[in-house]
């Protein structure tokens, strides 16, 4: 193992700040396995240890070590209200400290049982307490059903609630987070990236670096979602049984993705577990379009069809209302993130140490709504 200083100098990368938008990119194509933190705060640019054989020209370009006592809103925005109700999820995302907090160098996304909410009654001109519910709609916006959603939880992304991109990445990069997963049976935790150029899912592309099922600590899924195409599957999914005796919920592990010009490789604790060749995707546009920058997102979803325990299983974890006790005090339903980092390659500078950057572009936006009424976000992990 060798120690590589994290230095910003000599990086011939595009670092473009336009209002609320920061685009980080590189055009130099190379490979990297994974990297681990030793110590240090964001501002100190600490050293990181890279496995032998990893090119030494990859440096940390952007990171959050969560060393403060609150979320850094120059880097992150909150997700609000309902999310992915097509999968019949049962929570509302909030920005409340009981759902999103930072302490002792760790981000906490905590799900809790919270069966009611306050709603404004325009007829009485006062707030009233009502059951917390979600609404499923068809593709035309027609309501299919309203169902109980008695939980709150936390989710953050590098896009604000108005759709303004704070940070997004393009070119070659390696993104990694160190995470400890919640124990609650109906928790669906994820670390993922999504495109910012195209307005609809899955046209924008999606990279699921980590998806987990609370009832199965040995389960790991890494996915790529590409645009719909008639007669083709839009998802390239890969589920793994990880040989760690189920300690993903009692210890931290690293989850990463190396995105390159022709493929992406997923990593668990520094070991490659899955590779996706773009040429095998039905549509590879989101992953090769240099203007489709990728933003980061952490979500702690409660309930939903992703949690189905196999075909004909007698166990049901899709309905979190059967596991309310696991969410009452947050002790079992806490998703912890130690850090998130993005590396990009350092290019060789000329003798006069001149550098180049990518061309500028207008800030990108994605659709995100904050409202008192639960809103349905159609993006799916």
Please report, for each region that a protein language model flagged, where it lies by residue:
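Bacterial Sec-dependent N-terminal signal peptides
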Residues: 1-17, 31-36
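Intrinsically disordered, low-complexity serine/threonine-rich segments
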Residues: 9, 24, 29, 356, ...
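GH16 jelly-roll
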Residues: 38-356
